[in-house]
Amino acid sequence: MATARTPRFLLLFCRSCRSLRGPQSRAYAALVPGVSQVDNGSDFLGKKPHRKHPGILHLPHVQLPQALADAAQLMLFERPMRSVEKQVQALTNYLWSRHLPVEPEELQRRAAYLEKKFLEKQDSAPTEEKLREAVLHALRKTTYHWQELSYSEELSLIYMAARLDGGFAAVFRAFHEIQARIPEFRPQTLMDFGSGTGSVAWAAHRTWGQSLREYVCVDSSAAMLGLAEKLLKGGSESGKPCIPGVFFRQFLPVSPKVQFDVVVSAYALSELPSRADRIEVIQNLWRKTSHFLVLVENGTKAGHRLLMDARNLVLGEKEKSPLDLRPSFVFAPCPHELPCPQLNASKSLACSFSQAYHPIPFNWNKKPKEEIFSMVILARGSPKEANRWPRITQPVLKRPRHVHCHLCCPDGHMQHAVVTARRHGRDLYRCARVSSWGDLLPVIAPSEFPPSSPDEEPPEN
C-alpha cells in the first residue's frame, strides 16, 4: 500500500512544537515547588475515588424546598402587581451594586481635599459661600448616596421574588461546608440576624433536620417578619408551620448569657448605617455564638471588605469576652488567621464563590442561575481543629496534562499552582483536576509558601 509522504515543513513545525512544549511544562510545574504530594492522613485514597476526595465542597444546582417554592408562588400570585419582572430586576441590580455608607470622617477628608483643589485653581479667592457650594456640588457627584431600605408589604414581596432563591443557595452552601467537614456536629439552636424572608431557617433545616429545635429570626421590619412567617405556613396565615420551633423577633435577645450553636447574618451587615453600628452588631453576634458564626454578603469588593473587617474584629477580640473565654479562629474560607492576601494585592480582588441554583419557577425565572457571594465562618475553639488545606479561589482551568489552580495558602499568600502528574504525582493531579472553585486542595503544603509574582504566571492557554 502506498503511503503519503509528510511534507518537510510540517515535520519541522512539529519538532519545533515539541521543543517548545517541554521547557514550558517544566516551567509550569516549577510554580508549585512546595506542593509535592496528597495529604492522605484520612486514608481517603484507599476508600474513595479521586472525584470524592475530602476537599470537595462544591454543590450541584441547589433547589428550594418544594413547600417554600410553592408558598412563594402562591403569595405573589395572590397579590397582583404591575411590572413585577421589571421591579424584581431593578431591585436585584440595586442590591448588587450597593456600597457601604461613607463615614463622616471620610466625608470631611474628601471635602477638605476638594476645597484645596478649588482654591489652587482660582486666581482670586472665592467667597466662602461660593466655595461651600462648589465643594457640596462636587461631593454630591462623587460620593455614593446610601439610603436605608424601608420594607413595605409590597417591597417585601418584590424582595422575596428577587432574593429568596439566591440567598437560600448561598447560605445552604455555607452550612454544607460545616456539615461536610464536621458531620458529627448537630446544632440544636440557631439565631438569624436580619432574617428577611426566613431562608436561613429553611437552609438550616435542610442541612441538619430535626436536630435543630429552636430558630430565632430577628428582623427590624415587621412586614418582612410577617412575610417570613407566612412562607413558613405554606403561604397562608392560618397554616401549620413547615418547620417547628421557629420564633420571630424584631430585636436581638437582651441577655448576654444566651448563646446559640449557630449564629447567622446573611446580607444584613451591609444594611447597617455606619461602621460603629456594624462593630456593635458583630460583637453582639459573636458573644451569642456558641460554635459557629456564619456571615454572608454579596461577592463584591464591598461585601468582601466588610466581611474581612468583621473577621479581623472577632479575631482581635480574643480573651476579651468574660462569658466565653474560648479563642476564635477562621473555619472557612481562609486556611489562616493572617491578613487577607486578596485585599493586600496590588490589584485587590473580591474573595467570592459561586453557587448554581434553580430559581423559583416564575414566568421570567426559567433558566438556572448562579449566586456570587462572599462568606466567612468563624468558630470557637483551637485553630488546630481547623483544616489548613489551601482554598481554590478561582475557577479551575483544566488543560492537556496540567491544571491551573489559584490557591489561598495556610501561610497567608496567594499561589498560582500548575499541577502536573509528572511533577506532582498521579493522585494530586487527579484530585486537582476534579476540584472546583471553592474546594480545598488536599495537599501537604510547605510551612512557607513564596508569594507568586505576576511575571511568573504562565499563560492560561
From Swiss-Prot:
**What GO biological process terms does the UniProt entry carry, in alphabetical order?**
mitochondrial small ribosomal subunit assembly; ribosomal small subunit biogenesis; translation
Pfam families attached to this UniProt entry: Rsm22
Per UniProt, [4Fe-4S] cluster binds at 334, 340, 351, 408
Q: Please list the GO terms describing molecular function.
A: 4 iron, 4 sulfur cluster binding; metal ion binding; methyltransferase activity; mitochondrial ribosome binding; S-adenosyl-L-methionine binding
What is known about its subunit structure?
Associates with the mitochondrial ribosome (mitoribosome).
Domain comment, as recorded: [4Fe-4S] cluster-binding is essential for its ability to promote assembly of the mitochondrial ribosome (mitoribosome).
For this entry, the protein name equals Ribosome assembly protein METTL17, mitochondrial
